Design a protein with these regions (language model features):
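C-terminal amphipathic helix plus adjacent low-complexity
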Residues: 128-191
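Active-site donor-nucleotide binding/catalytic segment of nucleotide-sugar enzymes
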Residues: 1-41
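Hydrophobic, Leu/Ile/Phe/Ala-enriched alpha-helical segments that form helix-helix packing faces
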Residues: 18-26, 123-126, 187-190
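Flexible, charged surface loops at secondary-structure boundaries
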Residues: 1, 23-27, 57-59, 77-81
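A donor-sugar binding/catalytic signature common to diverse glycosyltransferases
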Residues: 69-118
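Nucleotide-sugar donor-binding patch of glycosyltransferase catalytic domains
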Residues: 102-146
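Short, surface-exposed amphipathic charged segments that create phosphate/polyanion-binding patches used
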Residues: 22-27, 45-51, 149-159
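Catalytic donor nucleotide-activated moiety binding site of glycosyltransferases and closely related
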Residues: 26-68
Length: 191
């Protein structure tokens, strides 16, 4: 069976390196990429000038399907259906967290590498108690242009363990009292 992957990123991500790694990696990959600003990088990887919604592109171990830009509900369904999700921005990583599937987050690139500080703060909280370092290593590489085939193969080799850990981590966050409830408790206590 192939690894199901969603790809939603900023155009400055190392897309060519990721697609190369997927195409030359140790397992078949079926990648779903909603049409967005990175479409030119995908087209170039496959030696095309343009790509269109509905295109299915193949190279090596990689089969990539170009999807239309999705509504939020459709995007949530895509996240739930995939084994691994590449997401961008804060809203997408929140949605990926609730999908309870392993994900790699790309923060929006900022001057003076502030996005890397944001990434490190996120990784410190999200990956607390994760015995594996691969999600952190891959996330850093994705934000710093350092994706390699060996790093990709390490990530997919641990995907089953990462899936179990991610499900537990999502349950941990779901068990916490939400902000609205905390505010109600706070006001009821007369503070």
């Amino acid at each position: 069976p192939s690894l199901q992957v969603s790809l939603f990123c900023y155009p400055d991500a190392p897309i060519k390196d990721l697609l190369t790694s997927m195409s030359q990696g140790n397992c078949p990959v079926e990648c779903f990429a909603p049409m967005a600003s990175y479409q030119h990088e995908i087209a170039a990887f496959f030696g095309l000038n343009t790509i269109n919604i509905g295109d299915t592109l193949n190279q090596g171990q990689l089969k990539l399907t170009v999807l239309p830009f999705l509504t939020q509900a459709e995007y949530d369904q895509l996240l739930w259906c995939c084994d691994l999700n590449f997401v961008r921005g804060e809203d997408s990583w929140i949605r990926a967290l609730w999908a309870s599937k392993p994900f790699i987050w790309q923060p929006y690139r900022q001057a003076d590498d502030l996005h890397l500080e944001k990434l490190e703060a996120f990784l410190k909280i999200y990956l607390k108690d994760n015995p594996s370092q691969i999600l952190a290593e891959f996330s850093r590489a994705w934000s710093e242009d350092g994706i390699t085939i060996s790093l990709w193969n390490r990530l997919i080799a641990e995907i089953d363990e990462l899936s179990s850990w991610t499900a537990q981590r999502t349950q941990h966050f779901e068990s916490q009292t939400d902000l609205a409830s905390k505010l109600v408790i706070f006001t009821e206590n007369g503070v």
